[in-house]
């Protein structure tokens, strides 16, 4: 599933920091250019290892897209929305943080929606390795949600700040895609604190739960 989210005002050269499990193919789809142009601009060849954190030259980029991989998997019955409780971050930094906390597979969420810090776009959706490998989450033990819920986190501390408009727009798009593909009813799209048995304020007191309800209910 792909959706254009912004035009760059004509072909321009930008830099993209490689996230966990990213591929040249996916990066090329993000910016609407060919894989070959990325290989050439960065002196890479197909099959060369991609180092997480390396900044790639993206030549002649014209737009930025959401690119969401979908997999046939009947285990996904819920979507649980979180905040990272950090003002800054991206998939790479939170992946490392979760490894340090003992999460053997790193980043505990399946998707991360960036807030424009740490080299990522405001509202950019990053797919975590857990999603690519279709692994259980490590985002909500309560009610056994790690085994049945897709974990979506927005970068930010929403006990202190509000999500950005771009983050909420991207969340709406992602929820629509996931709900449609996995036939998840609106009542099963919930904030972390709404999970039975969860003792947390996540996704924070300034997260617009009413808007989440409206978005899930409308399918937009």
Q: Which ranges hold each PLM region?
A:
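Short, charged beta-turn/beta-strand-edge "cap" motif at the junction between a beta-strand
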Residues: 61-65
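Envelope-exposed proteins and targeting segments
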Residues: 14, 52-54, 77, 107, ...
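Primarily a LysM-type cell-wall glycan-binding module
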Residues: 2-32
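Basic/polar, cationic surfaces and motifs that engage anionic cell-wall
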Residues: 1, 67-77, 115-129, 141-150, ...
């Amino acid at each position: 599933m792909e959706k254009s989210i912004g035009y760059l005002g004509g072909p321009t050269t930008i830099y993209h920091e490689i996230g966990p499990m990213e591929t040249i193919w996916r990066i090329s789809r993000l910016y609407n250019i060919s894989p070959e142009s990325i290989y050439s601009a960065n002196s890479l060849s197909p099959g060369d290892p991609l180092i997480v954190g390396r900044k790639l030259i993206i030549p002649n980029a014209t737009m930025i897209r959401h690119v969401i991989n979908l997999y046939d998997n009947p285990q996904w019955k819920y979507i649980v929305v979180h905040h990272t409780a950090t003002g800054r971050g991206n998939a790479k930094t939170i992946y490392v943080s979760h490894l340090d906390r003992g999460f053997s597979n790193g980043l505990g969420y399946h998707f991360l929606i960036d807030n424009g810090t740490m080299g990522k776009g405001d509202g950019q959706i990053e797919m975590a390795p857990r999603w690519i490998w279709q692994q259980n989450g490590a985002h909500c033990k309560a009610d056994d949600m790690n085994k049945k819920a897709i974990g979506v986190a927005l970068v930010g501390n929403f006990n202190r700040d509000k999500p950005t408009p771009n983050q909420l727009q991207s969340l709406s798009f992602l929820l629509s895609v996931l709900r449609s593909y996995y036939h998840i009813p609106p009542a099963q799209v919930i904030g972390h604190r709404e999970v039975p048995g969860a003792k947390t304020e996540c996704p924070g007191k300034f997260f617009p739960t009413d808007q989440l309800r409206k978005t899930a209910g409308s399918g937009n």
